[in-house]
């Protein structure tokens, strides 16, 4: 009997901080992507809570490639920690210009590993609800260490870096505040996403991802198409 051809699932890699790490929780935006891409693609979570782009750039070569499977898309979702105020949270803070260069370096590395620019999507940090996040900080014995206006500067830098790198971008900071809407419904603690926030990200990200994955086939035959008398003829064919 000839060697069996291994079935390879294409991959979508989610690379980011805690907002990505938590994306596979119930009602998370990553979980929604998994649901949409069942039997077509593996959605791989590489979210690292608390990380900034400085640390992300260092560990990226240890994360990508995951395997020899083709990569259909990579999301790069940082900025919520980079934008921490330097005088209040120097550990996570990354200066604005360095943040921008780190994002571009991440793209260069991914491209060097065979990921096309067209398959990379930046996601900006969401807006920050300062009153709610201050409560979280005070519970930990710290003063407010982020500002929405500063998060906006990092979001703008992310959008600009995306343009300079030739990659797509989902500008959450702008979209969640569009037309003066109450963005508090999108946040659970002033920084991280609520169920509605996760739904918002999933819906808007899917509009960018859909064309990149629309041609992915259903992997392995539908059960009703398997020949019950000789299943091998259905299941072992290329």
UniProtKB/Swiss-Prot annotation:
GO biological process: lipid catabolic process
Family annotation (SUPFAM superfamilies): SGNH hydrolase
GO molecular function, one term: hydrolase activity, acting on ester bonds
Enzyme class: hydrolase
Alphabetical UniProt keywords: Hydrolase, Lipid degradation, Lipid metabolism
EC number: 3.1.-.-
Disulfide bonds: none
Pfam families in UniProt: Lipase_GDSL
Annotated positions for site Transition state stabilizer: 50, 81
Catalytic center residues: 18 (nucleophile), 189 (proton donor), 192 (proton acceptor)
Domain of life: Eukaryota
PANTHER family: ISOAMYL ACETATE-HYDROLYZING ESTERASE 1, ISOAMYL ACETATE-HYDROLYZING ESTERASE 1 HOMOLOG
Function: Probable lipase.
Name the UniProt record assigns to this protein: Isoamyl acetate-hydrolyzing esterase 1 homolog
Annotated organism of origin: Danio rerio
Lineage, broadest ranks: Eukaryota, Metazoa, Chordata, Craniata, Vertebrata
Protein's gene: iah1
């Amino acid at each position: 009997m000839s060697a069996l051809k291994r079935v390879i699932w294409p991959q979508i890699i989610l690379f980011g901080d805690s907002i990505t790490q938590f994306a596979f929780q119930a009602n998370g935006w990553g979980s929604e992507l998994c649901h949409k891409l069942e039997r077509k693609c593996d959605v791989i979570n590489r979210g690292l809570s608390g990380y900034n782009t400085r640390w992300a750039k260092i560990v990226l070569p240890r994360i990508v490639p995951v395997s020899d499977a083709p990569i259909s898309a990579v999301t790069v979702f940082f900025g919520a920690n980079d934008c921490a105020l330097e005088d209040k949270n120097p550990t996570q803070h990354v200066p604005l210009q360095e943040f921008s260069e780190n994002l571009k370096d991440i793209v260069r590395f991914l491209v060097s590993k065979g990921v096309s620019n067209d398959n990379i999507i930046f996601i900006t940090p969401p807006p920050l609800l300062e009153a709610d996040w201050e409560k979280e900080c005070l519970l930990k014995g710290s003063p407010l260490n982020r500002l929405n206006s500063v998060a906006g500067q990092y979001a703008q830098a992310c959008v600009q870096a995306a343009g300079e790198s030739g990659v797509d971008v989902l500008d959450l900071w702008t979209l969640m505040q569009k037309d003066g809407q109450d963005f508090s419904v999108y946040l659970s603690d002033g920084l991280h996403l609520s169920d509605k926030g996760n739904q918002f990200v999933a819906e808007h990200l899917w509009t960018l991802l859909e064309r990149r994955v629309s041609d992915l086939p259903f992997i392995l035959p539908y059960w009703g198409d398997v020949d019950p008398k000789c299943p091998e003829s259905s299941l072992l064919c290329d």
